[in-house]
Swiss-Prot record:
GO biological process: ceramide metabolic process; regulation of ceramide biosynthetic process
Disulfide bonds: none
Segments on the Cytoplasmic face: 1-21, 64-94, 143-153
Gene that specifies this protein: ORMDL3
Mode of membrane association: Multi-pass membrane protein
Name of the molecule in the record: ORM1-like protein 3
Record PTM text: When hydroxylated at Pro-137, ubiquitinated via 'Lys-48'-linkage, leading to proteasomal degradation. In endothelial cells, ORMDL3 proteasomal degradation is controlled by the sphingosine 1-phosphate receptor signaling pathway.
UniProt subunit comment: Ceramide-sensitive subunit of the serine palmitoyltransferase (SPT) complex, which is also composed of SPTLC1, SPTLC2/3 and SPTSSA/B.
Length: 153
């Protein structure tokens, strides 16, 4: 028996999306966002779907592809300090179940949004640009790449 040792991850960011119930909670949070936006009077259904998609993708971009480091004091001696949450997830292994889920979710939301906006040109362009802004950083070829030095430090 090891007294005084903890059984935890070196970096908790690596396994947070593999926790029990996190996928269901994520989908329910998107649904709750949509219901809250639907409750705003005088806002049409297509606008609500577009807002749901844009807010979701903006949050995903900020939390997964912009914020770097960990909110915890980790014993990894700063290895995760320069990595985004997406790069830390599953220890950087590509094509895991969590990464696939987080890649497919904005695509499904995009299809739903396109359908409910009846493929209106303005909504379609906004939603497509939003989708590309969260899908392109997820590509394995862009792992650790900082385009034009943005978010380098």
């Amino acid at each position: 028996m090891n007294v005084g040792t903890a059984h935890s991850e070196v970096n908790p960011n690596t396994r947070v999306m593999n926790s029990r119930g996190i996928w269901l909670s994520y989908v329910l949070a998107i649904g709750l966002l949509h219901v809250v936006l639907l409750s705003i009077p005088f806002v049409s259904v297509p606008v609500v779907w577009t807002l749901t998609n844009l807010i979701h993708n903006m949050g995903m971009y900020i939390f997964l592809h912009t914020v770097k480091g960990t909110p915890f004091e980790t014993p990894d001696q700063g290895k995760a300090r320069l990595l985004t949450h997406w790069e830390q997830m599953d220890y950087g292994v590509q094509f895991t179940a969590s990464r696939k889920f987080l890649t497919i979710t904005p695509i499904v939301l995009y299809f739903l949004t396109s359908f409910y906006t009846k493929y209106d040109q303005i909504h379609f362009v906004l939603n497509t640009v939003s989708l590309m802004s969260v899908l392109i950083p997820k590509l394995p070829q862009l792992h650790g790449v900082r385009i034009f030095g943005i978010n380098k430090y």
